[in-house]
Amino acid sequence: RGLVGSEMCIRDRGYMRIYVAGSIFVMMTLGLNMFITTQGFAKISMKTVLIGAICNIILDPLFIFAFHMGVKGAAVATILSQAVSAVWVFSFLNGKQTKLRIRKEYLKVQPQIILPVMGLGLAPFVMNITESLINIAFNASLSKYGGDVAVGAMTILASIMQLQFMPVQGLGQGAQPLISYNYGAAKVYRVKKTIRILIVVSLIYTMAFWLFVECFPGVFVQLFNSSSPELYEMTTWAARIYMGMTGIFGIQMAIQQTFMSLGQAKLSLFIACLRKIILLLPLIYLMPMFIENKVFAVFLAETVSDFISVAVASTLFLCNIKKILAKA
């Protein structure tokens, strides 16, 4: 309540209760859709996402405005949309095309299978949960040193960074089954080729995006702000600092996805923790102690963290990849 305000807390609570009650549909859609992607049905997997998104776009105004449900209506629309996607996924996984069918006799908890799966899933879980902690830390520090304008700038920058990182994350998820399958089949050449393509393409995209942001930050800022000159000025200035090292961050994302694909849960988890928990979280609070411009120091923490984490991830990759592939 103290972080978001009492009025916002009441609205969020109404949304959250409905969303949590129906979250089983969200989990089923996200989890089972990966089994469609793994079999090579990328278009079907994409349709799963589109079905949920299109249904949500249609149902949102209906429940929010037509049925006068407000925020609760948005939650109902989201859950119903995900339920439609879940039905689509189930129908495909019980259809003629799929090789992996849902059968009652397969639904058994086997520790020798589920424990390694949980280990590999721990890294992305940590990444997602620490994202919330980082956002709280950034907002608290920027609110203290720069007020509402600095917090608003941070919100815009986080959205811009998502535009940069989401395609790379999708690329990595697409490469995972290719790397894992060929590694299991001892086709080391194909593994190396896939890893090389993943790293190169990820780096090219993040570098191109970074270069555009550094040269024309105002283009992205205008997408999120059209009314406040002060916010525009703050965000365009902060973008060059906050995203100063995101150009090379595609390397770390590719390396982390590679380690996950090769069954190296500990290395993948360490890289996930390194950037956010070990480096970024302390730097957000420590750097303003040593730099006069406190707002600049908070934004700079992201750049310093990115540089160190990419350097460490690259070193771990170069030192371990040959040993890992030798076990194929």
Q: What are the roles of these predicted feature ranges?
A:
Residues 6, 62-69, 132-159, 163, ...:
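Helix-terminus/linker motif at the lipid-water interface of multi-pass membrane proteins
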Residues 26-45, 153-217, 249-268:
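Small-residue-rich hydrophobic transmembrane alpha-helices
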